[in-house]
Regions:
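Rossmann-like AdoMet
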Residues: 1-114
Length: 114
């Protein structure tokens, strides 16, 4: 559980950022253990070289979730053929999927909304 804010100035986005950070570190661990290839994750994590590996269950779960979404997107792109497609990624945080897809596909237009 998250601790209640201790001051009136507590950052209301802190729990969201903490969740994103935890997911990014789990992804880094999964990459370092050889489950996934992702050259973009380490630069997104402060002091990545100091991060400890996550337990095997976290690595396997991160791998399965990533592969499932990647396979769905691959099928979707294949079925679309040369038609224009649109991806709306809500709450992507430090997800590197855009960069990993951009290496394989040509994006004519993209928008980032922070």
């Amino acid at each position: 559980m998250f601790q209640p804010p201790t001051t009136k100035n507590a950052d209301p986005d802190a729990p969201t950022r903490a969740t994103d950070n935890d997911a990014a570190i789990a992804r880094l661990s999964t990459v370092r253990k050889g489950y996934l290839a992702d050259p973009y994750i380490a630069p997104l994590i402060p002091r990545a070289h100091l991060q400890q590996p996550r337990p095997p269950l976290i690595n396997i779960g991160t791998y399965l979730r990533t592969r499932a979404v990647d396979l769905l997107l691959d099928d979707w792109f294949r079925l679309a053929g040369r038609q224009k497609v649109q991806i709306v990624s809500l709450g992507a945080g430090s997800d590197t999927r855009f960069w990993r897809l951009a290496v394989r596909f040509i994006f004519n237009t993209f928008f980032f909304v922070g």
